[in-house]
Each structure stands twice: as structure tokens, then as C-alpha cells.
């Protein structure tokens, strides 16, 4: 009985002490506002378009050149044309994701309605290859080639001016259009058609 009374007393005392703790004080009315949150280095972006009446989107993170002109796509650059590690997530952070509400032909790859991960093979600096991969939810540099739905060559060009932040773009004109990737002094595009 003594132990029961001691335990009950301890529980009561602990409850009383915890109830007396002060809540954090709110800042005084003249206190400066807290510092604004820092913008992410590679902010999330989304390109959208309609081809053949089907909504298409590409979700990606957009890194910036940030004073590294001429140092992005070089032998020892940020995104190197290294034949031993040629596949690029074509963005930053999580892998770039394509979502389509309808069946498409992207270049010569049949892409059924659904969600996919996009990679770009840049081992040949003059001829990039778009890779449509069935495995989604990847982070960073993870790539499983056994999950490729297909690969298609991209048309290379130079943008009219330096592209500071990586950008995907979807342009649709009825049942056809283009998907374009541009960053720094590189631009690569691929034709897209609604698949019947």
C-alpha cells in the first residue's frame, strides 16, 4: 500500500510540474521578422503542354549556371561527357519525371499513358539521346538501364542566348509537337506525336 501511495504521489507531482512549464513566449510586437527561407539552389519546375488532346508534364529541378559559363558541358565540367558515366538525370535532386495522360510517340519510342523517368545520354556531345525509363521515384544519380522503355536521338542546336537555368519545354500543335531541353549553351529537342 505504501508503494502505491508513493507512486501515486510521484505521478501527481510530475503532472503538476509539467503543467507549470511555460509555453514559449511569442516575440515582442517590435521584434524583427524571422529571416526568410533561402530559395533552393535548384528550384522545382514543371513544364506542361497538350498534344493530341492529352495533357503532358515534365517535373524537374532547375540548376543554374551561376557563373560557370563554359564549364557545364566540358570534359571535366559539371556535366561531363564521360563515356564511363554518360547518363544524366537532366535536372537536379530527384530524377526528371514525364507524365502523360495519353499514348505518345516520343521520337521513335512508343510511350503509353503513364509516368516515367527521363534521362539523357550525353556521351556524344554532338548527339544526345533521350532515355524514357519505367522506374520512377529515383533520387540523385540512380539509373537502372534494364528499366528503359526506349531511347531516341535528340536534335542538337545552340540556343539564341545563354540559358541560365535548366529548362524543359513542351510545345504542342494539335496532334504533334516537341519536347526541348536547354541549359547553358546546349539545346536538344525531340518530336512528339499523339499515338493512335
Where would I find each of the regions flagged by the language model?
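Positively charged n-region of N-terminal signal peptides that target proteins for export
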Residues: 1-4, 20
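Sec-dependent signal peptide hydrophobic core
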Residues: 5-12
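Residue-level marker of positions within ordered structural domains that often coincide
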Residues: 6, 121, 184
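N-terminal signal peptide c-region/cleavage motif recognized by signal peptidases
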Residues: 14-16
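Primarily secretory-pathway and cell-envelope proteins
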Residues: 21-86, 135-196
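Mid-length scaffold segments of soluble, non-membrane domains
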Residues: 83-138
Amino acid at each position: 500500500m505504501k508503494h502505491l501511495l508513493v507512486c501515486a504521489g510521484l505521478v501527481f507531482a510530475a503532472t503538476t510540474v509539467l503543467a507549470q512549464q511555460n509555453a514559449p513566449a511569442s516575440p515582442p510586437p517590435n521584434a524583427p521578422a524571422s529571416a526568410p527561407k533561402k530559395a533552393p539552389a535548384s528550384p522545382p519546375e514543371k513544364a506542361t503542354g497538350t498534344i493530341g488532346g492529352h495533357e503532358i508534364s515534365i517535373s524537374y529541378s532547375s540548376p543554374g549556371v551561376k557563373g560557370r559559363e563554359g564549364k557545364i558541358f566540358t570534359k571535366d565540367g559539371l556535366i561531363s561527357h564521360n563515356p564511363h558515366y554518360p547518363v544524366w538525370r537532366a535536372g537536379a535532386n530527384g530524377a526528371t519525371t514525364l507524365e502523360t495522360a495519353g499514348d505518345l510517340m516520343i521520337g521513335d519510342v512508343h510511350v503509353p499513358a503513364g509516368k516515367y523517368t527521363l534521362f539523357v545520354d550525353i556521351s556524344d556531345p554532338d548527339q544526345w539521346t533521350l532515355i524514357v525509363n519505367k522506374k520512377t521515384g529515383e533520387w540523385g544519380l540512380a539509373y537502372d538501364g534494364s528499366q528503359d522503355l526506349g531511347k531516341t536521338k535528340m536534335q542538337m542546336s545552340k540556343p539564341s542566348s545563354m540559358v541560365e537555368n535548366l529548362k524543359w519545354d513542351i510545345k504542342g500543335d494539335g496532334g504533334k509537337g516537341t519536347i526541348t531541353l536547354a541549359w547553358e549553351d546546349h539545346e536538344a529537342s525531340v518530336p512528339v506525336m499523339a499515338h493512335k
